[in-house]
Amino acid sequence: MAVARKIRTLLTVNILVFVGIVLFSVYCRLQGRSQELVRPLSGGCRPRPATPAPGSPLRSGGPRAVVAGRAELVLKGQLPAEPCSPGRLMVPEAEAEAQGGLAATLRDDGQEAEGKYEEYGYNAQLSDRISLDRSIPDYRPRKCRHMSYAQDLPQVSVVFIFVNEALSVILRSVHSVVNHTPSQLLKEVILVDDNSDNVELKFNLDQYVNKRYPGLVKIVRNSRREGLIRARLQGWKAATAPVVGFFDAHVEFNTGWAEPALSRIREDRRRIVLPAIDNIKYSTFEVQQYANAAHGYNWGLWCMYIIPPQDWLDRGDESAPIRTPAMIGCSFVVDREYFGDIGLLDPGMEVYGGENVELGMRVWQCGGSMEVLPCSRVAHIERTRKPYNNDIDYYAKRNALRAAEVWMDDFKSHVYMAWNIPMTNPGVDFGDVSERLALRQRLKCRSFKWYLENVYPEMRIYNNTLTYGEVRNSKASGYCLDQGAEDGDRAILYPCHGMSSQLVRYSADGLLQLGPLGSTAFLPDSKCLVDDGRGRTPTLRKCEDVARPTQRLWDFTQSGPIVSRATGRCLEVEMSKDANFGLRLVVQRCSGQKWMIRNWIKHARH
């Protein structure tokens, strides 16, 4: 009996010892991981570095002269972690390669790196090995480097929005803005966490910024995922400086970015300033210069870079501000009070997409202006994967319709056309816009026609469109007229899917055009369906390239034939074993086939 008790006691002791070892190991791993980011810098912590002298390496974009301290070196993998932690591979060459914005690589770029690519949309493992204080090239026009600014510029609150971002990328954004903004101008840095799932972005981030930048960096945490638009509104509410800069949390700032932006806003508080954007390559973190550009959009309200306006090109001064109709959205700087006066961002929009275009329309139509500033530059990672990817097309469509209904007057039909959806019962609930309409009335804003004529004259106008959408034939109702290959010249029949390749427009002039709207003078327009009379196959050509204009003209009524004005032949469908889906488009003697188009605009726009 006594022997049995001794055996049970020994077993219990052994089990407790084993459990203790496991728990201690876990504790050490967690503690080591935490200490990688929160250990104080050698020599003690300071709230922030002093403003560099004009000739210092930091001021000119060179590397910091001060050794970073153990915490940063552990983060970069240049020193082992604490003895009981998992440790990291030492790869000092990654930091050396990345200095000056050059491309960097890792020799151990294996399965772990691939997993991080998938998670973040960029090479997060490489980012962990690159200095938080690395230098990047000064891509400002030469004239910018010799400009001087007033001493009493307003202070700025810099707001970063993130959700499930790599910690080292967030910290590099913070280090970069602190390093490249004069201390008297930077009031605070506000990090808005849009309800990240990543545990590393909670305790580790808090401890790091509280120790490294006490009192300078604030963290705002959303209790639920709000999306980029409403997360920015939270940042605006938390900001206390007279000017607020909104940025993605995967950027690096160039030397002298703040002074020109703040100077332009000081001159006119109704001016929204967009730093010029350069690119950080997602795979190697190489910083690549982008050409100076304005920010435009197509009729679907997707933003894009466009050529600067002709008057800017004629001026011949690369440092001059560039008038821009809208903004890409990853960075903008605005007077805090003015931003509130004009209605912030539309809180009824979801996630992101369209809010950047809507803001451009609103600012211009309501008496303000928007410009890209080549002397103020920010490098930005264009990620291959974004955290809000689920259903982003739906949200972008919904947001576009909200903007169209409030700001675009009769031109809102162009947005419905671009998305290939009906104007009545579009299948998208864009919510109540009454408050935004009241805002427009209260601000006494101009018409969208004024905006197109004075701010975005490059937009193509489709006011003479009578009808648009999917076109089906009575002989094959499940198939739609389709532009076929983008670079081809043959229209086809294809199972109906409602995408832009099946957008057909019939104009008051008699043009039948297939494919996505060309939207601006910078993009090719949709092609015309042509019957040249030389064969039975209709072709697609650029409308302006058709030799005889009547060859591109058709007569069409709902549930009736489509008849060529040049030949009197009808566009019809014939069965053919050699054709895709056994259906071929032909022009031939009319046999009574009928065509139906989905959406009608009741009268031509003038």
UniProtKB/Swiss-Prot annotation:
Residues 153-264 are annotated as: Catalytic subdomain A. PROSITE patterns: RICIN_B_LECTIN. Residues 1-6 are cytoplasmic. Glycans are attached at N463. Its EC number is 2.4.1.41. Residues 43-62 are annotated as: Disordered. It is found in: Golgi apparatus membrane. Pfam families: Glycos_transf_2, Ricin_B_lectin. Pathway: Protein modification; protein glycosylation. Keywords: Disulfide bond, Glycoprotein, Glycosyltransferase, Golgi apparatus, Lectin, Manganese, Membrane, Metal-binding, Signal-anchor, Transferase, Transmembrane, Transmembrane helix. It catalyses: L-seryl-[protein] + UDP-N-acetyl-alpha-D-galactosamine = a 3-O-[N-acetyl-alpha-D-galactosaminyl]-L-seryl-[protein] + UDP + H(+); L-threonyl-[protein] + UDP-N-acetyl-alpha-D-galactosamine = a 3-O-[N-acetyl-alpha-D-galactosaminyl]-L-threonyl-[protein] + UDP + H(+). Its cofactor is Mn(2+). Gene3D superfamilies: 2.80.10.50, Spore Coat Polysaccharide Biosynthesis Protein SpsA, Chain A (3.90.550.10). Substrate binds at D194, R225, R383, Y388. SMART domains: RICIN (SM00458). It is a single-pass type II membrane protein. Mn(2+) binds at D248, H250, H380. Disulfide bonds join C144-C375, C366-C445, C480-C496, C528-C543, C570-C590. GO terms for molecular function: carbohydrate binding; metal ion binding; polypeptide N-acetylgalactosaminyltransferase activity. The chain crosses the membrane at residues 7-29. Residues 321-383 are annotated as: Catalytic subdomain B. There are two conserved domains in the glycosyltransferase region: the N-terminal domain (domain A, also called GT1 motif), which is probably involved in manganese coordination and substrate binding and the C-terminal domain (domain B, also called Gal/GalNAc-T motif), which is probably involved in catalytic reaction and UDP-Gal binding. The ricin B-type lectin domain binds to GalNAc and contributes to the glycopeptide specificity. Catalyzes the initial reaction in O-linked oligosaccharide biosynthesis, the transfer of an N-acetyl-D-galactosamine residue to a serine or threonine residue on the protein receptor. Does not glycosylate apomucin or SDC3. Belongs to the glycosyltransferase 2 family. GalNAc-T subfamily. This is Polypeptide N-acetylgalactosaminyltransferase 9. It comes from Macaca fascicularis (Crab-eating macaque).
